[in-house]
């Protein structure tokens, strides 16, 4: 198994798909990295030469990935909560932050329904 940015990526898949297993690398970023490294998108991960692996690693080193990216996202959310912005308040209360209605739905964000004693329609 090849290892990029501390993540084992699958051998049998095409390299363009395998790179998306790294947090912070989607399909478009994967295509850009491979183009800059001069590696074909159709090659399988197991068929990469060591030179090609090194070229891909050099391109990935310039990106913010895995732990650094996760840390930045969590710090951004923490900053929103500290400054008391609307989005920060929604994060603090565990509600959707992007304007969705919460009267009937939003169960993923709010958690399981809490029954209210004596409430009947």
Swiss-Prot record:
Keywords per UniProt: Ribonucleoprotein, Ribosomal protein, RNA-binding, rRNA-binding, tRNA-binding
Domain of life: Bacteria
Keyword Ribonucleoprotein belongs to the record: yes
GO MF entry, a single one: structural constituent of ribosome
Pfam families to which the protein is assigned, alphabetical: Ribosomal_S13
KW Ribosomal protein (keyword) present: yes
GO annotation, biological process: translation
InterPro entries in UniProt: Rbsml_uS13_C, Ribosomal_uS13, Ribosomal_uS13-like_H2TH, Ribosomal_uS13_bac-type, Ribosomal_uS13_CS
Entry-linked Gene3D superfamilies: 1.10.8.50, 30s ribosomal protein s13, domain 2
Cellular component terms per the entry's GO annotation: cytosol; small ribosomal subunit
Region (Disordered): 88-121
Biased composition (Basic residues): 106-121
NCBIfam families referenced in this protein's UniProt entry, alphabetically: uS13_bact
PANTHER family for the chain: 30S RIBOSOMAL PROTEIN S13/40S RIBOSOMAL PROTEIN S18, SMALL RIBOSOMAL SUBUNIT PROTEIN US13M
Membership in a protein family: Belongs to the universal ribosomal protein uS13 family.
Function in brief: Located at the top of the head of the 30S subunit, it contacts several helices of the 16S rRNA. In the 70S ribosome it contacts the 23S rRNA (bridge B1a) and protein L5 of the 50S subunit (bridge B1b), connecting the 2 subunits; these bridges are implicated in subunit movement. Contacts the tRNAs in the A and P-sites.
Quaternary structure and partners: Part of the 30S ribosomal subunit. Forms a loose heterodimer with protein S19. Forms two bridges to the 50S subunit in the 70S ribosome.
Protein name: Small ribosomal subunit protein uS13
Organism: Lactococcus lactis subsp. cremoris (strain MG1363)
High-level lineage: Bacteria, Bacillati, Bacillota, Bacilli, Lactobacillales
């Amino acid at each position: 198994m090849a290892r990029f940015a501390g993540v084992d990526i699958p051998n049998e898949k095409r390299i363009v798909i395998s790179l998306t297993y790294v947090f912070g690398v989607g399909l478009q970023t994967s295509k850009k990295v491979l183009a800059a490294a001069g590696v074909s998108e159709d090659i399988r991960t197991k068929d990469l030469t060591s030179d090609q692996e090194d070229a891909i690693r050099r391109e990935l080193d310039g990106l913010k990935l895995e732990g650094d990216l996760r840390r930045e996202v969590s710090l951004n959310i923490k900053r929103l909560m500290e400054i008391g912005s609307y989005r920060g308040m929604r994060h603090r209360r565990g509600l959707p932050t992007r304007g969705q209605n919460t009267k009937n739905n939003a169960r993923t964000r709010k958690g399981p329904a809490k029954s209210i004693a004596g409430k009947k329609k």
